[in-house]
């Protein structure tokens, strides 16, 4: 079925920054997608096109990307007359039209908006939900797998004030019997955590960060983990709810001396206290021995390959590559060859089309990696990643705390999918890393 209209506009994300929204119109109606954007972005990501005009939106406008959709991509794609159900052909055409390796010509934000809106049009034409269409495109087996929600309940690093270096502390309800129960457990722990943070650190500690987590004035990882452990205990889920961390260590890596500065937010940071990667690896291991940590994301800097391989050999929990792999097939291949990690963080806007995102997941599965589908810190009401997580059988999704509508939108969408699928879906639970094989 041909596309009759493609129209892009500038809308706002959850941080008040402009982002791209794309409408694709076919005989089945209007199909809309909004593109997210990140705060801590890896240097190997696909290029997000921003206007750079400091007099508007501080240079963060997306009018160029919008114009590229309306004047270049839209007319060309309509003229090409590709079937909207043929996602790989559409995405291949978009990449060819751009002509660069990192989508810097038309902008990954322009291309992704079109790619995702076309996927929704394709699902509508088949008369199936988006997750079912994605499952067909990826060739995943049945039953569907509902992901474990990794809920970012406490923020540090670049996402918060305070001296805490690590960026995210997540709760992982992997013992729950279903997705809806997992979400209930997470929400209950989150409420306890918020109350505890206010009690211990003052009223403002209940304020939430970009992703809905609390950001009390915490100095160390132990302090953060103790607070979360106490909240889990108060909610009655000790032993049932695990913990995951996203360290985002590229943010505090001193490349010139190859050391990590856990006090990076302090301008007077003492270089004698900076850690080598071996010392940082030992810190992670001591934390994992003391707390129920099942997953660590970006434990080392994005180009400190030696550190990743060293850590991988000596640890037994999930090691997730985000800045390391940036959902890029070439980087994933290198990480597999160097045995750097065992799970991929899948962010569709890092690679820029749905087809390449599916391929990144398949490449990861082929080497027995886990795949965690992820939001960005600048999010919107778009829920596509919920359908992607279910369609790919990824078994794990990271989309913030059970707080702030742009985070809940995804979790609520999975609740709807769970209800719709009934017996035809299983909850990944503790098998989240190997969910694709369930």
From Swiss-Prot:
Binding site for Mg(2+): 246, 297, 322
GO MF annotation terms: IgE binding; magnesium ion binding; phosphopyruvate hydratase activity
Native species: Aspergillus fumigatus (strain ATCC MYA-4609 / CBS 101355 / FGSC A1100 / Af293) (Neosartorya fumigata)
Thylakoid listed as a keyword: no
UniProt xrefs under Pfam families: Enolase_C, Enolase_N
Main location group: cytoplasm
Key words of the record: Allergen, Cytoplasm, Glycolysis, Lyase, Magnesium, Metal-binding
EC number: 4.2.1.11
Keyword Cell inner membrane part of the UniProt annotation: no
GO biological process: glycolytic process
Gene: enoA
Paired cysteines (S-S): none
Protein name: Enolase
């Amino acid at each position: 079925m041909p596309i009759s209209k493609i129209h892009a506009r500038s809308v706002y994300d959850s941080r008040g920054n402009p982002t791209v929204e794309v409408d694709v119109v076919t005989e089945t109606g209007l199909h809309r997608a909004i593109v997210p954007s990140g705060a801590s972005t890896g240097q190997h990501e696909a290029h997000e096109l921003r206007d750079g005009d400091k007099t508007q939106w501080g240079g963060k406008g997306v009018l160029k990307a919008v114009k590229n959709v309306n004047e270049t991509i839209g007319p060309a794609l309509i003229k090409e007359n590709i079937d909207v159900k043929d996602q790989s052909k559409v995405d291949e055409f978009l990449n060819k039209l751009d002509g660069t390796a990192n989508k810097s010509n038309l902008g990954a934000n322009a291309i992704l908006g079109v790619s995702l809106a076309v996927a929704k049009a394709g699902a509508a034409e088949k008369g199936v939900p988006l997750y079912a269409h994605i499952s067909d495109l990826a060739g995943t087996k049945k039953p569907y797998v509902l992901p474990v929600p990794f809920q970012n309940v406490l923020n540090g690093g670049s996402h918060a004030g305070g001296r805490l270096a690590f960026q995210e502390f997540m709760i992982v309800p992997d013992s729950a019997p279903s997705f809806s129960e997992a979400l209930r457990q997470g929400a209950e722990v989150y409420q306890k955590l918020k109350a505890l943070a206010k009690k211990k650190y003052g009223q403002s500690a209940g304020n939430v960060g970009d992703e809905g987590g609390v950001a009390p004035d915490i100095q160390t990882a132990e302090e953060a983990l103790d607070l979360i452990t106490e909240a889990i205990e108060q909610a009655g889920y000790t032993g049932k709810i695990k913990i995951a961390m996203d360290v985002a260590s590229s943010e505090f890596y001193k490349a010139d001396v190859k050391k990590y500065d856990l006090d990076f937010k302090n301008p007077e940071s003492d270089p004698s206290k900076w850690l080598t990667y071996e010392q940082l690896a030992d810190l992670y291991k001591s934390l994992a021995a003391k707390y129920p940590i099942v997953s660590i994301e970006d434990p080392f800097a994005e180009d400190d390959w030696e550190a990743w391989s060293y850590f991988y050999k000596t640890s037994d929990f999930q090691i997730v590559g985000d800045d390391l792999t940036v959902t890029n097939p070439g980087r994933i291949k290198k990480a597999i060859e160097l045995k750097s990690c065992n799970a991929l963080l899948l962010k569709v806007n890092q690679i820029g089309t749905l087809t390449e995102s599916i391929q990144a997941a398949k490449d990861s599965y082929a080497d027995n990696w886990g795949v965690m589908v992820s939001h960005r810190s600048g999010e919107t009401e778009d829920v596509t990643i919920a359908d992607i997580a279910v369609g790919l059988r990824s078994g794990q999704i990271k989309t913030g705390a059970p707080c702030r509508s742009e985070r809940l939108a995804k979790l609520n969408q999975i609740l709807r999918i769970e209800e719709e699928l009934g017996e035809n879906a299983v909850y990944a639970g503790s098998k989240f890393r190997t969910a694709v094989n369930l």
